[in-house]
Regions:
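Amphipathic alpha-helical assembly/interaction segments
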Residues: 1-127
Length: 127
């Protein structure tokens, strides 16, 4: 039987890396102090899900509409970094876990920035 459906585009490395980072966060979230799990932990969780959602949606958008969605993803990433730092400063996350997550987040940031920059070079500015 011949399939007439086009396969979905392969997932960009940024999405795969974000999924891996979210898996790390998910394990940390379960051990998050109960007093802060649904406030600070919930905020970080929401930003992570927003990051994943915006990267995923960006895959399927036409090039001219990807850039605004990537800007949102980058701002979600910045929010994760900010609230994770607050969690670490308040001893909700160990140094090792914070360091590991931070390394992943920095790499995701470089990937998203490169993706955005590449699109800006290819996409003509709107008239």
């Amino acid at each position: 039987m011949v399939s007439y459906f086009t396969p979905p585009p392969s997932a960009p490395t940024a999405l795969l890396k974000a999924k891996t980072c979210y898996s790390l966060w998910f394990k940390i979230y379960n051990d998050f102090p109960k007093a802060h799990r649904y406030t600070l932990g919930g905020k970080i969780e929401d930003y992570f899900l927003g990051l994943l959602e915006n990267i995923f949606i960006s895959i399927y958008l036409p090039p001219e509409t990807k850039i605004p969605r990537l800007v949102i993803a980058i701002s979600k990433l910045d929010g994760i970094k900010f609230f994770l730092q607050i969690a670490w400063e308040n001893k909700c996350i160990s140094n090792e876990k914070y360091s590991s997550l931070s390394e992943h987040l920095q790499e995701i940031g470089r990937m998203l920035g490169g993706w955005k920059k590449g699109l800006e070079k290819k996409t003509p500015p709107p008239k």
